[in-house]
Amino acid sequence: LHLLSRRQRQMCIRDRGKNAFVQVFESTRGMRVGDEAEFEGHMLEVTLGPGMLSRNYDGLQNDLDKMEGVFLRRGEYTFPLDNDKLWDFKPLAKVGDKVAGGDWLGEVDENFQPHKIMVPFTFKGEYTIKSLKEAGQYTIGEVIAVLTDETGKDVEVTMIQRWPVKRAITCYKEKPRPYKLLETGVRTIDTVNPIVEGGTGFIPGPFGTGKTVLQHAISKQAEADIVIIAACGERANEVVEIFTEFPELVDPHTGRKLMERTIIIANTSNMPVAAREASVYTAMTIAEYYRSMGLKVLLMADSTSRWAQALREMSNRLEELPGPDAFPMDLSAIVANFYARAGYVHLNNGETGSVTFIGTVSPAGGNLKEPVTENTKKVARCFYALEQERADRKRYPAVNPIDSYSKYLEYPEFQEYIAGHISPTWIDKVNEIKTRMLRGKEISEQINILGDDGVPVEYHVIFWKSELIDFVILQQDAFDAIDAVTPLARQEFMLNKVVKICHAEFKFNTFLEVMEYFKKMINIF
């Protein structure tokens, strides 16, 4: 609904008798008793169609590039797409075909990506194509097909459709367990704790440990067709950095501008709390839309903590019973439902698509026991724990190799995929280096207590083998042109070399010899 006086967008989230509880997506300053409101008859919706790539939106899908001034003015909205642009349409179906919601009618070329024009997701049941436009140039508002439903009623279809952000798009045949490795070029992810196409992961860590840099590295380098960045409640300077940096970046896979396959949805921390909550749902809905085209979509949300804070704010204002740290009692269900929208799907026509979701969590004071981290840990299959101690020692990315994990390593489907595409011994080697890292940490603590001379030389060898793994495989320079992205073949080569060195027997007389030898070895890499 919206106020008639200022056209402010808002949504009814609860009603009791004659009273409606309304979530306002903008500042409520100046609102007064007696203001008239008008219901529009639908939930908060996004407009889906060709022309979304390369755009910068806010949480309500306003095109920020069309807005003037430094700040967003209340009640000012812009249409998210270009009404006048002509698109080269090619039909993929024919007159007489039976179709359902989500089926492909045709395609247009959007930034060198085939953008499928689909039967609107809101259509229920089976339809017959009565007429379909021939190949040619059309605007998004022109009728490109007329469908007949089971009752004989004709329905017109254009290139655009609308969908409520709080509902998942489920126009697919099945949603199996994901198993294909998503290559990111980041060694501590691909080698040690891999994520898959259609997988979920989260990156918790205190401020200053490199969450945003790691997210940017993944979004630049991941083998995804579409990248969506949801800056939810970020500081304004970080959002500006995204806006200025991404248009300049080159996609390492295609050599074209990275922005051509990217959508940015920005909600800074000084924007209204309710809009912050809407931004992650808007991003996920757009991601599901592109998944329905058979594309691999990567969605990065920074940070889901601020989204949860928005949920807490609204829960408090609704006077609901508070849970731990005043978060809503149903926080775990809200987080689980949102993460469940990601996934790998088989479409009705046999094609596959995926939404891979990686969110960051900013726990207050780096406390990983707080409710948002705990509830996210239950549903996300990958956990990349950023550690202040590693960041202070400049060991970036500061992902703790012992606390972090990937549940996908336990999936038989993933193990079979890795054995066929990389090596049958890959997972065994990964588990071995994790064990060596844990043993190295235990010995490091003993050396700190007893001193270098207080432990046997063999212990120093075990410790320095774990340091070799740390320096060679785990640490990576995100700002170096070569080291920033490591292809999978090179990761396999490095892992095999390091494991071979770890298996070798060494004879040293003093701990100083051990240190000198392994330092030289690390420098060679």
Predicted regions and their residues:
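Single conserved hydrophobic/aromatic residue that forms the stacking wall/gate
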Residues: H2-R9, I13
